[in-house]
Amino acid sequence: MFENLKKADPEIYESMKRELKRQQRNIELIASENIVSVPVMETMGSHLTNKYAEGYSGKRYYGGCEYIDEVETLAIDRIKKIFGAEHANVQPHSGANANIGVYFAMLKPGDVVMGMNLSQGGHLTHGAPVNISGQYYKFYEYGIDKDSGLIDFDEVRKIAHEVKPKMIVAGASAYPREIDFKKFREIADEVGALLMVDMAHIAGLVAAGLHQNPCEVADFVTTTTHKTLRGPRGGVILCKEKYAKDIDKAIFPGIQGGPLEHIIASKAVCFKEALSDEFKEYQVQVAKNAKALAEELIKRDFKLISGGTDNHLILLDLTNKNITGKAAEKRLDDAYITANKNTIPFDPNGALVTSGIRLGTPAVTTRGMKEEDMAIIAEAIDLCLTYDEESKARTLVVGLTEKYPLYEEYNVMD
């Protein structure tokens, strides 16, 4: 594979080769990353990238789209089946585009919206001042209870009744517990607000029935396809049928032009995988591994925000380890453990330094690791962050990654 690239552009080939070796060598604990299957990867690199297909199935602005229509329809039908959704738009290029698409469809500049505070687990597109969402719309932030580490629904209700938002946004990028979407629905109904759920991080768990399905209560549900869903980089919007025309118009021609049909095809492949029993078993293991890793870290005197996890991610509070999130990320990377610094709720260090590390188990689970391997990973993390023993940690990491190859099917690059 990639032999033509090797001849045509050896510089890019070598960079790709080094990146593949890094992925094989390292333990990947970034909660938003995963490892796609070979069929998904093959579809992304296919001739479907040659085709322009502005519009939607049966209503394109270019000729020759009959087979593209087949592909996009399959993707739509499959994801609707996974989540029991009434309508799906699979064209968003990213989760951010999916979120902005919903806002563009249903809000006007200056409308009042509620979203989770970024430093307490939310996402940039949920109203952060530096993001277009926070500049075009008037966002009010809710957060978590300082003692429990859980979403403070009393605060959510209080703010909602005070500001009367047109929309409430639920969902998070660094929240380790199950989110009660029904409670968000109750509050939204009390103030006459629309409810949008961003389930980008937990979509795979929802698909497997391991988390509340927001499609049952929300007006709009957005997701990425590359995290726990284990597909290509992209986004999706799910909504009630009554909003379908508004959503489709907002994506095209509203904020995007031609869809990426090679990516939509690989989304369809990913969705077929997500309908399988094997995928459900995989998600069960993702959750088991997260709990096992959390328990092993607690044994080693690590503090976890909320005291544990209900999903695929863990948020470490490093304030008792005398190390910042930024320094911890670097030290872990030196030991071949990839993670990301992350703010913890009420973080004194700010977003560039932070006091926390976010960990996730989707990628290591895809490689085949189980609960007993989480104990080894926890030991490696402890060696790095408590004892500054990166060399010993590297030995543990290499032993694991050599045991669990990235792609067993074939040698991707020589």
UniProtKB/Swiss-Prot annotation:
Alphabetically ordered keywords of this record: Amino-acid biosynthesis, Cytoplasm, One-carbon metabolism, Pyridoxal phosphate, Transferase
Alphabetical list of InterPro entries matching this protein: PyrdxlP-dep_Trfase, PyrdxlP-dep_Trfase_major, PyrdxlP-dep_Trfase_small, Ser_HO-MeTrfase, Ser_HO-MeTrfase-like, Ser_HO-MeTrfase_PLP_BS, SHMT-like_dom
UniProt-annotated site: Plays an important role in substrate specificity, residues: 226
Reactions the enzyme catalyzes: (6R)-5,10-methylene-5,6,7,8-tetrahydrofolate + glycine + H2O = (6S)-5,6,7,8-tetrahydrofolate + L-serine
Any GO MF annotation of the entry: pyridoxal phosphate binding
UniProt GO cellular component terms: cytosol
Pathway assigned to this chain's UniProt record: One-carbon metabolism; tetrahydrofolate interconversion; Amino-acid biosynthesis; glycine biosynthesis; glycine from L-serine: step 1/1
Cofactors: pyridoxal 5'-phosphate
Record localization: Cytoplasm
EC number, UniProt record: 2.1.2.1
GO-annotated biological processes: glycine biosynthetic process from serine; tetrahydrofolate interconversion
Residue sites binding (6S)-5,6,7,8-tetrahydrofolate per the record: 118, 122-124
UniProt cross-references to PANTHER family, sorted A to Z: SERINE HYDROXYMETHYLTRANSFERASE, SERINE HYDROXYMETHYLTRANSFERASE 1
Quaternary organization: Homodimer.
Protein name: Serine hydroxymethyltransferase
Lineage of origin: Bacteria, Bacillati, Bacillota, Clostridia, Peptostreptococcales
Gene label: glyA
